[in-house]
């Protein structure tokens, strides 16, 4: 289904999601391809707000975390779900007694129950599911085989499987192990909003400075989804707030694109440069105006005014 709207300035700002195409008014000669989520504030638990392109005539394309996002969007975390039985139930893992670490819900797995990042209960999407039957009639209790050993350390991090992740890291020392795209367990956890996993990995030696093959960072991935708690943890570790990857974006540009106001403010207060431009020549303010994100625009304007006042003083 395609929808188009003529622009007042003779150009189009096109937002594409899967086969759907939307047309919005915006800046001249800009084409943006990305999953449409204009009302997002804190990052969706089910989607990935990345994968955008800024296209201008005779300009370089900007693909935000393209390879990683493509694998997540097209396969819908296929690498994780292919190894999980469709009948598995979400259950609790009493891991607090051993590690005193809380897990958060896993957006990368589809189960019968819907959870959000705000859920605080312990869980394990791959824990054995138990079917209770009437023993008086001769029926026995049936269980589903446990598949944790078949999951990679990256999949465990993305799902928030704290118990199995901690055991795997202790046994194999793979806390900074990279996948085929150069992504670490920390990057996967940051991209999926797994706050407790990110905290656990950082406390146990995960390197937040490591980059993917396209120079993607854990901070950029977290900013693209608006996970403010994770963004704060990474900033507290001293990561480069202005890390510019080969896809043409910085953490601030990703946060602006996702309309994540709190992340934008946090990044600016931590020294993010609002004047850095994409490969297409647009800075964070240009992008906020083009996408119609007024709240983000106001945050950037307020920050720029403070900078000007400090210069005058």
From Swiss-Prot:
The keyword Methyltransferase does not apply. GO terms for cellular component: cytoskeleton; cytosol; membrane; nucleus; protein-containing complex. Changing residue 31 to R: No effect on interaction with CCDC8. One of its GO terms (biological process) is regulation of protein-containing complex assembly. One of its GO terms (molecular function) is low-density lipoprotein particle receptor binding. Keywords: ANK repeat, Cytoplasm, Cytoskeleton, Membrane, Repeat. ANK repeats lie at residues 148-180, 181-213, 214-246, 247-279, 280-313. SMART domains: ANK. InterPro entries: Ankyrin_rpt (IPR002110), Ankyrin_rpt-contain_sf (IPR036770). SUPFAM superfamilies: Ankyrin repeat. It comes from the Eukaryota. The keyword Repeat applies. Its main location: cytoplasm. It is found in: Cytoplasm, Cytoskeleton; Membrane. It is a peripheral membrane protein. May regulate the interaction between the 3M complex and the histone deacetylases HDAC4 and HDAC5. May also regulate LRP2/megalin. Interacts (via ANK repeats) with CCDC8 (via PxLPxI/L motif); mediates the interaction with the 3M complex which is composed of CCDC8, CUL7 and OBSL1. Interacts (via ANK repeats) with HDAC4 (via PxLPxI/L motif). Interacts (via ANK repeats) with HDAC5 (via PxLPxI/L motif). Interacts (via ANK repeats) with LRP2/megalin (via PxLPxI/L motif). Interacts (via ANK repeats) with RFX7 (via PxLPxI/L motif). Interacts with AHRR. Interacts with NEK6. The ankyrin repeats, mainly ANK 2, ANK 3 and ANK 4, mediate interaction with a wide array of PxLPxI/L motif-containing proteins including HDAC4 and LRP2. The PxLPxI/L motif of interactors can contain a Ser or a Thr residue in position 2, which phosphorylation prevents the interaction with ANKRA2. This is Ankyrin repeat family A protein 2. It comes from Homo sapiens. The gene is ANKRA2.
């Amino acid at each position: 289904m395609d929808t188009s709207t003529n622009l007042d300035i003779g150009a189009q700002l096109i937002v594409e999601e899967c086969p759907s195409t939307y047309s919005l008014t915006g800046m001249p000669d800009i084409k943006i391809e990305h999953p449409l989520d204009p009302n997002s504030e804190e990052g969706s638990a089910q989607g990935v707000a990345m994968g955008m392109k800024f296209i201008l005539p005779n300009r370089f394309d900007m693909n935000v975390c393209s390879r990683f996002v493509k694998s997540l969007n097209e396969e819908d975390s296929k690498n994780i779900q292919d190894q999980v039985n469709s009948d598995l139930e979400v259950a609790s893992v009493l891991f607090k007694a051993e590690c005193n670490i809380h897990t958060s819900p896993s957006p990368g797995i589809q189960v019968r129950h819907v959870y959000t990042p705000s859920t605080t209960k312990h869980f394990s999407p791959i824990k054995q599911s138990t079917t209770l039957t009437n023993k008086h009639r001769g029926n026995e209790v049936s269980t589903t085989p446990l598949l944790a050993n078949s999951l990679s350390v990256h999949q465990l991090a993305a799902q928030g499987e704290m118990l199995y992740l901690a055991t795997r890291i202790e046994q194999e020392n793979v806390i900074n192990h990279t996948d085929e795209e150069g992504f670490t367990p920390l990057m996967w956890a940051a991209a999926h909003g797994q706050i407790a996993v990110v905290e656990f990995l950082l406390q146990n030696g995960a390197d937040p400075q490591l980059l993917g093959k396209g120079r993607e960072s854990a901070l950029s991935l977290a900013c693209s989804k608006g996970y403010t708690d994770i963004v704060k943890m990474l900033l507290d570790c001293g990561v480069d707030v202005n890390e510019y990857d080969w896809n043409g974006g910085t953490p601030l540009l990703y946060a602006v694109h996702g309309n994540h106001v709190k992340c934008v403010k946090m990044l600016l207060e931590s020294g993010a440069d609002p004047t850095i431009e994409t490969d297409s020549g647009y800075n964070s303010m240009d992008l906020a105006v083009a996408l119609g994100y007024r709240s983000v625009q106001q945050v950037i304007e307020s920050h720029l005014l403070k900078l000007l006042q400090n210069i005058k003083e």
